[in-house]
């Protein structure tokens, strides 16, 4: 039995953005500048608080990132929605990594709390997605809780992140 890869470097993540990792028409990450992490450090089908699997990733922060000059001029901060989107991106990646077919789409989240900010002085953002359930039916649906850390401190939490994989309808 082949072991699944448990970490991905930037070039491998970009290959996913081009549709080369899980095959055309299947889970795909956005390409830069919307790709919100540089590497996936760990991914597993088991473990995490619910023992349903998890994914961990990191994003190197530099003062020249595209969003700092425009959000906000004179008061640069990473938009909170980009951190939330990163959590959805990772949830969809996990479903593709499981071998499930279909194109990933964010569906919803339960609750989101922002308790801190990412500024140009931040060095490292870490993401954690802990799966609660993966449902396989007409669509594949992943449900997970997520967190985001800035330089080691949890600053975002999201519950019940939902991402679906949708198959193309036959004509």
Curated annotation (Swiss-Prot):
Pfam families: FabA (PF07977). GO terms for biological process: unsaturated fatty acid biosynthetic process. It catalyses: a (3R)-hydroxyacyl-[ACP] = a (2E)-enoyl-[ACP] + H2O; (3R)-hydroxydecanoyl-[ACP] = (2E)-decenoyl-[ACP] + H2O; (2E)-decenoyl-[ACP] = (3Z)-decenoyl-[ACP]. Its EC number is 4.2.1.59, 5.3.3.14. InterPro entries: FabA, FabA_FabZ, HotDog_dom_sf. The active site is at residue 71. GO terms for cellular component: cytoplasm. Pathway: Lipid metabolism; fatty acid biosynthesis. It is found in: Cytoplasm. Its main location: cytoplasm. Keywords: Cytoplasm, Fatty acid biosynthesis, Fatty acid metabolism, Isomerase, Lipid biosynthesis, Lipid metabolism, Lyase. One of its GO terms (molecular function) is trans-2-decenoyl-acyl-carrier-protein isomerase activity. The keyword Lipid metabolism applies. Necessary for the introduction of cis unsaturation into fatty acids. Catalyzes the dehydration of (3R)-3-hydroxydecanoyl-ACP to E-(2)-decenoyl-ACP and then its isomerization to Z-(3)-decenoyl-ACP. Can catalyze the dehydratase reaction for beta-hydroxyacyl-ACPs with saturated chain lengths up to 16:0, being most active on intermediate chain length. Belongs to the thioester dehydratase family. FabA subfamily. Homodimer. This is 3-hydroxydecanoyl-[acyl-carrier-protein] dehydratase. It comes from Allorhizobium ampelinum (strain ATCC BAA-846 / DSM 112012 / S4) (Agrobacterium vitis (strain S4)).
């Amino acid at each position: 039995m082949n072991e699944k890869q448990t970490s991905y470097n930037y070039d491998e993540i970009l290959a996913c953005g081009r549709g080369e990792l899980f095959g055309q028409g299947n889970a795909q990450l956005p390409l830069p500048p919307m790709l919100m992490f540089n590497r996936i450090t760990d991914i597993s089908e088991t473990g995490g608080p619910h023992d349903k699997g998890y994914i961990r990733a990191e994003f190197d922060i530099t003062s020249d990132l595209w969003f700092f000059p425009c959000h906000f001029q004179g008061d640069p901060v990473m938009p909170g929605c980009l951190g939330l989107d990163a959590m959805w991106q990772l949830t969809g990646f996990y479903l593709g990594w499981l071998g499930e077919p279909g194109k990933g789409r964010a569906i919803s989240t339960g609750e989101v709390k922002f308790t801190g900010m990412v500024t140009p002085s931040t060095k490292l953002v870490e993401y954690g997605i802990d799966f609660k359930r993966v449902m396989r039916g007409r669509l594949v649906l992943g449900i997970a809780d997520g967190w985001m850390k800035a330089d080691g401190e949890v600053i975002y939490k999201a519950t019940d992140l939902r991402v679906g994989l949708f198959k193309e309808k036959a004509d």
